[in-house]
Amino acid sequence: MNSKKILVTGGAGAIGFNLIQKLLKLGNKVTSWDNYSAGTTDNHIQGATYINRHTKEASFLDNSYDLVYHLGEYSKVVPSFDEIENAFDYNVLGSFNLINKCRELDIPIVYAGSSTRLAEPGQLHSPYAFFKSTVAKLIEGYGDWYGLRYNICYFYNVFGPGTNLWANEWQSVINIFKKQREEEIPLTITGNGTQKRDFTHVNDIIQGLILAGDNLKNDQFQLGTGIEYSVLEIAAAFDHPIEFIPPRPGDRMNGLAKIEHTSETLGYKPTVNVIDYIKSL
């Protein structure tokens, strides 16, 4: 990536923290917009500019930017049933304003879509999944109607450095199990534990985002490993007692990334295996 002026929405969140860190190392000038509904000042990195701003305030965007990474949305699946107004505000109203401004200024956008759109039962799985799918479709439409340049990236169950900074119980199961083991309490498994996930290290997510920003193709890319593990297998890797709790609304059974297109088109190569990572903790 050549030196660019880049806006990262949600830059004080877990993924934003890691992305900005990498973008700065590559010599880019980076500004973050975050309303700190989930992000934290603990994620601020020296060298980046941080502005407390909702994406509905997209009128502040100007044509000095070369690229926008749009990560700043409501990101909780299960709570979205009770917080549907917030999810709509962040993920539909805010995103529309930002996308429309990017179209007006001819600034390309890399969007952090949700892999829930690609799973059964898809976009109707939860308010969160529906709104994220709506935004992805809107970006596709803006590409067709107005020539907006974009890529959409779908994340699969992110773990690794920085992701433990998600300040609520709706964290990655990896972080939950790690904390439960440290506190010497049983690992809690929702449902029967046979649900399978593609667990992706945050460094691999960042690799994919950088590649997507360098290769704007008006395309969609799944960022995962192409390998799935059941929650029971993840728990076994922690080698700690477990207990089962009732399933939650919005939980899905399976989620496996199909990364062939991403690898062939962008040169994406996942590097971290989740079981190896757990055993190194």
Predicted regions mapped to residue ranges:
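Hydrophobic alpha-helical packing elements
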Residues: 15, 87, 131, 173, ...
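Solvent-exposed, non-membrane alpha-helical residues enriched in polar/charged side chains
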Residues: 21, 140, 175-179, 263, ...
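N-terminal Rossmann-like NAD(P)+-binding domain of SDR-like oxidoreductases, especially those catalyzing
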Residues: 1-158
